[in-house]
A protein has these predicted regions:
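N-terminal glycine-rich anion-binding loop in soluble enzyme alpha/beta folds
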Residues: 1-56
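Flexible, charged surface loops at secondary-structure boundaries
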Residues: 1-3, 66-70, 107-109
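Conserved beta-strand elements of the Class I
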Residues: 7-9, 111-115
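Gly/Ser/Thr-rich loops at beta-strand to alpha-helix junctions
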Residues: 14, 72-85, 100-103
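Short, well-structured alpha-helical segments in soluble
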Residues: 54-70
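N-terminal active-site wall of soluble small-molecule enzyme domains
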Residues: 57, 61-62, 77-87, 91
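Short active-site oxyanion
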Residues: 70-74, 93-94, 111-112
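Short, acidic/small-residue loops that bind anionic groups at enzyme active sites
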Residues: 87-110
Length: 115
């Protein structure tokens, strides 16, 4: 049975993606499609004054491209993109989870440590 792929939106970064990293295809036992958002690095997304319109435009365009390529859901390579969850989910043709940090809200009355 053919599995539909997960799409991964990646910031334009250049560092080794070891097995276990979201940006390494060998980390998955199912199909994954990666899209690097050319020209959108971590500083663009989370600087003191990020260029939100440019980042959102890149997220939207690449989300649409991944959906067109068959992705049935999207994740990202950087938890910083959690800042864009609501905006991206509103325009993405498929479900989006930008960061595992989204699960913090499901831990009411618990102490959470984020490093």
């Amino acid at each position: 049975m053919k599995q539909n792929p997960l799409g991964i939106l990646m910031l334009d970064t250049r560092f080794p993606r070891i097995v276990g990293d979201v940006g390494n295809a060998a980390s998955y036992d199912f199909p994954v499609i990666f899209r690097r958002m050319e020209g959108i690095g971590s500083a663009d997304a989370v600087a003191a004054h990020p260029d939100r319109p440019r980042v959102l435009a890149a997220l939207k365009a690449n989300a649409e491209a991944l959906a067109t390529e068959g992705a049935v859901g999207l994740g990202t390579s950087c938890g910083f993109l959690a800042l864009y969850q609501a905006d991206l989910a509103a325009v993405s043709p498929v479900p989006v989870a930008t960061s595992a940090l989204l699960h913090i809200a499901k831990l009411p009355q618990r102490r959470v440590g984020v490093i």
